[in-house]
């Protein structure tokens, strides 16, 4: 009889703690669903993946970004996260480090191309 009384209480506590895909955030607006669906399809998933899969992946992405941001804030200057802080955090993960280097290089190339295009169009 005591066990029967504990089970409903346990379930209620579990729901309050936030067990499940929401990760304690309750029902929140999904920010990256469209992009994640496209990425999942690009990596070989179905064109219309299960909503639950997209939601779980989004929770993982947001958790990763949040943790990285908190770590970057703790090692860098107060109140600012800089690119160097992120690079420092991922320096021991070769795949992430290489990808960030590639993205930073492409960003610089795009900046130079835009500058050259603007100079050609508007003449300096």
Curated annotation (Swiss-Prot):
Q: Where is the composition biased (Acidic residues)?
A: 1-16
Q: What is this protein called?
A: Transcription initiation factor TFIID subunit 13
Which CDD domains does this one have? HFD_TAF13
Keywords on record: Disease variant, Intellectual disability, Nucleus, Transcription, Transcription regulation
Q: Where is the Histone-fold domain?
A: 31-74
**Organism of derivation:** Homo sapiens (Human)
Q: What does this protein do?
A: The TFIID basal transcription factor complex plays a major role in the initiation of RNA polymerase II (Pol II)-dependent transcription. TFIID recognizes and binds promoters via its subunit TBP, a TATA-box-binding protein, and promotes assembly of the pre-initiation complex (PIC). The TFIID complex consists of TBP and TBP-associated factors (TAFs), including TAF1, TAF2, TAF3, TAF4, TAF5, TAF6, TAF7, TAF8, TAF9, TAF10, TAF11, TAF12 and TAF13. TAF13, together with TAF11 and TBP, play key roles during promoter binding by the TFIID and TFIIA transcription factor complexes.
User: Among its keywords, does the record have Transcription regulation?
Assistant: yes
Gene name, please? TAF13
Q: Looking at the UniProt record for this protein, which Gene Ontology cellular component terms does it annotate, in alphabetical order?
A: nucleolus; nucleoplasm; nucleus; transcription factor TFIID complex
**Oligomeric state and partners?**
Component of the TFIID basal transcription factor complex, composed of TATA-box-binding protein TBP, and a number of TBP-associated factors (TAFs), including TAF1, TAF2, TAF3, TAF4, TAF5, TAF6, TAF7, TAF8, TAF9, TAF10, TAF11, TAF12 and TAF13. Interacts with TBP, and more strongly with TAF10 and TAF11.
Q: What GO annotations for molecular function exist for this entry?
A: DNA binding; protein heterodimerization activity; RNA polymerase II general transcription initiation factor activity; TBP-class protein binding
Localization, UniProt: Nucleus
Per the similarity annotation, which family is this?
Belongs to the TAF13 family.
Show the domain comment.
The binding of TAF10 and TAF11 requires distinct domains of TAF13.
Q: Which disease is it linked to?
A: Intellectual developmental disorder, autosomal recessive 60: A disorder characterized by significantly below average general intellectual functioning associated with impairments in adaptive behavior and manifested during the developmental period. MRT60 patients display mild intellectual disability, delayed psychomotor development, learning difficulties, and poor overall growth with variable microcephaly.
- What processes does the entry annotate via GO biological process terms? DNA-templated transcription initiation; mRNA transcription by RNA polymerase II; positive regulation of transcription initiation by RNA polymerase II; RNA polymerase II preinitiation complex assembly; transcription by RNA polymerase II; transcription initiation at RNA polymerase II promoter
Region spans: Disordered: 1-28
């Amino acid at each position: 009889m005591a066990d029967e009384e504990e089970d409903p209480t346990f379930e209620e506590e579990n729901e309050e703690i936030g067990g499940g895909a929401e990760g304690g955030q309750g029902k929140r607006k999904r920010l990256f669903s469209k992009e994640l669906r496209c990425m999942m399809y690009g990596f070989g998933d179905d064109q219309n993946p299960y909503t639950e899969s997209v939601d779980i992946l989004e929770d993982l992405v947001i958790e990763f970004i949040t943790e990285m941001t908190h770590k970057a804030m703790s090692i860098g200057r107060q109140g600012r996260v800089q690119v160097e802080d992120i690079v420092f955090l991922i320096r021991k993960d070769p795949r992430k480090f290489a990808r960030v280097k590639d993205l930073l290089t492409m960003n610089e190339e795009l900046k130079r191309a835009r500058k050259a295009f603007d100079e050609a169009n508007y003449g300096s």
